[in-house]
Amino acid sequence: MSSKLVLVLNCGSSSLKFAIIDPANGEEYLSGLAECFNLPEARIKWKMDGAKHEAALGAGAAHSEALNFIVNTILAEKPELSDQIAAIGHRIVHGGEKFTASVTINDEVIQGIKDAVPFAPLHNPAHLIGIEEAKKGFPHLADKNVAVFDTAFHQTMPEEAYLYALPYNLYKEHGIRRYGAHGTSHFFVSREAAKTLNKPVEELNVIVCHLGNGGSISAIVNGQCVDTSMGLTPLEGLVMGTRSGDIDPAIIFHLHDSLGMSVEQINKLLTKESGLLGLTEVTSDCRYIEDNYATKADAKRAMDVYCHRLAKYVGAYSALMEGRLDAIIFTGGIGENSALVREQVMKKLALLGFEYDHDRNLAARFGKSGAITTDNSRPALVIPTNEELVIAQDAARLTA
């Protein structure tokens, strides 16, 4: 065991993912999830030394109680593990324009995260609680907390990619522009792709599809992001689990004026009731859609819309590749595991020189990486993401 482990925290609005990782080799010594915050069934699950555990946190418990449990119950039973923690890495969804890379957390960084709350109203406040509680739980590491921003990797986008065609003053005065998300995943996967393709990162031109309950796609030219599908918030872009992705903005006025829906109701509809859930009217679970694609109209409808949108984005981003596309990469829970999504998308991309291989596609699932195209094809690769490792490595590097 290394003497410099990193505690990685990912505080969501109603959950907290945590892990203790050796940044040198990626080995996980502890991983877990606390969920159902502020509800009677608030609970925590964790895995340590190969064994799985679960406990109730108490009715109404939230981030504070979860971190208290991690420090005073889980780690109290394993002091030798706790003693090895040398830094704490925090996933931060939105850093606005201020943060182009990971940073050690100080008062100025805290203020920057607060300033970006309007762009991530559910996540950024939770991150701030996580930082505060981590400093309380590990007072000796108060100056060893590091923020890793989902938006940072996309800060290389040129103006023509991040500006909306709105009055320019809205950008200058209020920061209304496209920021993107999942940047840590896009960064990690593109670097892994460079190794797989045996190319220097600074010469790498790829399109990365991060497909999970949230989904985004990025165009990476010479190792840097030049465009991405998520916008001011993670609502723009692809069809997602419960998010609509791109829609005609006038639909919002129609829902308000003609159907009498309030702004709050429309927000809930677009973020929590749309996407795959809206299209199936049953579930946002891609596994249901894949299992029932051939037999149920709702599953076929959802899958077809999802893949149509994704293939369209890949086609659009191929125009940004400056004449050379090295590969397309699939990652995230759906990207890594849904052979059907990849098959449907690849079949639409034959014009770009992709030749789909059925057997390879079925083999590259459940944590396995690999090509899903023939030997003569332009490569399409499955590469499992590891955002926690990036966070751990950045935290270790910045606090060394």
UniProtKB/Swiss-Prot annotation:
Pathway: Metabolic intermediate biosynthesis; acetyl-CoA biosynthesis; acetyl-CoA from acetate: step 1/2
Gene3D superfamilies linked to this entry: 3.30.420.40
Keyword Transmembrane helix: no
Chain residues that bind substrate: R91
Catalytic activity annotation: acetate + ATP = acetyl phosphate + ADP
Cofactor, how bound (note): Mg(2+). Can also accept Mn(2+).
Family: Belongs to the acetokinase family.
Protein name, per record: Acetate kinase
